[in-house]
Amino acid sequence: MSKETKLQVEAIKNGTVIDHIPAKVGIKVLKLFDMHNSAQRVTIGLNLPSSALGSKDLLKIENVFISEAQANKLALYAPHATVNQIENYEVVKKLALQLPERINNVFACPNSNCISHNEPVESSFKLSEKNNDIRLKCKYCEKVFARDVVTEIEA
């Protein structure tokens, strides 16, 4: 490996690597998986050089393996990210991201009049995609929102 292509972020022995996250999205993904509250070592790479994206974010969490269902939630933020499960420094499984049909109890509804804000119910959105445009429809108020509108709100 030449100096120019040397790893900028240390390899992990066991755990999960989420790579090819668009720049400035890594922190949102960190919070989505609650990694910032983990007792395990988390390595964060922000604005790393990428030939495909220009710049990218990267997350590595040791001794934690993200499920396929969790990885699919990632598709909202980074549909082209890669999720690799590592054992003994080797990639043992690559998770393909698919947009889930429904996402529950992750995001708050942007509609301040929605009953999900005042009733003891979990937020729930049905997802749809057309021409790389992801839309979320609230189960309760039935309003449709752009992905960016829903994912910018703290639940």
Curated annotation (Swiss-Prot):
SUPFAM superfamilies membership: Aspartate carbamoyltransferase, Regulatory-chain, C-terminal domain, Aspartate carbamoyltransferase, Regulatory-chain, N-terminal domain
Listed cofactors? Zn(2+)
Q: Tell me the InterPro entries matching this sequence.
A: Asp_carbamoyltransf_reg_N, Asp_carbamoylTrfase_reg, Asp_carbamoyltrfase_reg_C, Asp_carbatrfase_reg_C_sf, Asp_carbatrfase_reg_N_sf
Q: Any idea which GO molecular function terms this record carries?
A: metal ion binding
Q: Which one GO biological process term can you cite for this protein?
A: pyrimidine nucleotide biosynthetic process
Report the domain of life of the source organism: Bacteria
The reply on keyword NADP is no
Identify the residues that bind Zn(2+).
109, 114, 138, 141
Q: Which PANTHER family match?
A: ASPARTATE CARBAMOYLTRANSFERASE REGULATORY CHAIN
Q: How is the subunit organization of this protein annotated in UniProt?
A: Contains catalytic and regulatory chains.
What is the annotated role of this protein in its UniProt record?
A: Involved in allosteric regulation of aspartate carbamoyltransferase.
What is the protein name given in its UniProt record?
Aspartate carbamoyltransferase regulatory chain
Q: What broad taxonomic lineage does this protein's source fall under?
A: Bacteria, Pseudomonadati, Pseudomonadota, Gammaproteobacteria, Vibrionales
